[in-house]
């Protein structure tokens, strides 16, 4: 391991800001950045020696790679975190436009929805992972939420309640229980978890998350986040009566005034159920 990679890993371990998922993503991005800086010729760089020239070199490299606006923003966010931890918080402009990076577009070009197939579930040997995947499919949960799901806390009469510490951005939320299928799933979760999270007693969260990732790959599920997309599209059809644009339904511009009002109401509901605070993000799902 190169010096910079090692120092950034230590920096991340000493400053565990955010959820487990956020920490893991940050470490992965910073490890990539350290490798890119090495390739750019900064081979003896230290974590405390971060300078504007390094940021400029990285941004130039990323533009050559034609990465998405969202990826730009995630990488710059990791760089700002790094700069802040080494006492250089003001070194990187807060406005991404300083680097010629525009606003993220939330307009999806094609559906990323993924339906959970029986044959895929049959390849999952870990019953905890199997139930986490079913929760993701049935309630549109993120991976971390579905692993940390604790039935004694979460299951209410007509909804499930997600604790802030389980969620991205620390936003607690509830998702309605609408079907008998969902209730049967929650009973299965109660029986296995016995009040605790969907993590076996002999493992911690990180170990179970890694096991989840391995099992999902083995089952051939390339994009488990697509289960959230499928949930969003099902809910949209339930709430409006027609399919979402990305699922083959009518484009928003073709809707009548009455339909547009219903469309906006549905997007607000779905955004809240998915844990987002802006309805514009639903364009990625719908």
Each predicted region: which residue ranges?
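N-terminal core-binding DNA-recognition domain of tyrosine recombinases/integrases
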Residues: 9-104
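DNA breakage-rejoining catalytic core of tyrosine-based enzymes
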Residues: 100-119, 168-181
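Basic, Lys/Arg- and aromatic-enriched nucleic-acid-binding interface segment
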Residues: 114-143, 261-267
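Short, charged phosphate-coordinating catalytic segments
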Residues: 136-159, 283-284
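Conserved tyrosine-mediated DNA breakage-rejoining catalytic core shared by Y-recombinases
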Residues: 148-185
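Short functional hotspots where side chains directly engage DNA or cofactors
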Residues: 159-165, 248-286
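Active-site/catalytic core of tyrosine-dependent DNA strand-transfer enzymes
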Residues: 178-241
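Short basic/aromatic active-site micro-motif
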Residues: 220-264, 276
């Amino acid at each position: 391991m190169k010096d910079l990679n090692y120092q950034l890993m230590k920096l991340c371990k000493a400053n565990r800001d955010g959820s487990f998922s956020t920490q893991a993503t940050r470490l992965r991005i910073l490890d990539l950045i350290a490798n890119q800086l090495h390739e750019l010729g900064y081979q003896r760089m230290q974590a405390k020696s971060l300078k504007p020239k390094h940021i400029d070199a990285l941004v130039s490299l990323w533009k050559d790679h034609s990465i998405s606006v969202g990826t730009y923003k995630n990488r710059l966010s990791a760089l700002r975190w790094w700069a802040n931890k080494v006492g250089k918080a003001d070194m990187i402009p807060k406005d991404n436009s300083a680097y010629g990076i525009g606003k993220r577009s939330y307009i999806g070009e094609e559906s990323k929805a993924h339906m959970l197939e029986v044959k895929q579930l049959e390849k999952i040997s870990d019953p905890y992972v199997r139930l986490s995947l079913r929760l993701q499919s049935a309630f549109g949960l993120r991976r971390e939420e579905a692993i940390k799901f604790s039935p004694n806390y979460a299951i209410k009469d007509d909804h499930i309640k997600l604790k802030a510490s389980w969620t991205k951005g620390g936003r607690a939320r509830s998702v309605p229980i609408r079907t008998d299928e969902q209730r049967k799933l929650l009973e299965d979760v109660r029986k296995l978890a016995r009040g605790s999270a969907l993590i076996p007693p002999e493992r911690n969260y990180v170990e179970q998350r890694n096991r989840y990732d391995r099992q999902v790959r083995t089952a051939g599920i390339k994009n488990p986040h697509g289960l959230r997309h499928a949930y969003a599209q099902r809910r949209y059809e339930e709430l409006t009566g027609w399919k979402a644009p990305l699922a083959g339904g009518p484009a928003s511009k073709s809707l009548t005034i009455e339909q547009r009002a219903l469309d906006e109401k549905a997007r607000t509901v779905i955004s809240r159920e998915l844990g987002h605070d802006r309805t514009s993000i639903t364009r990625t799902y719908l």
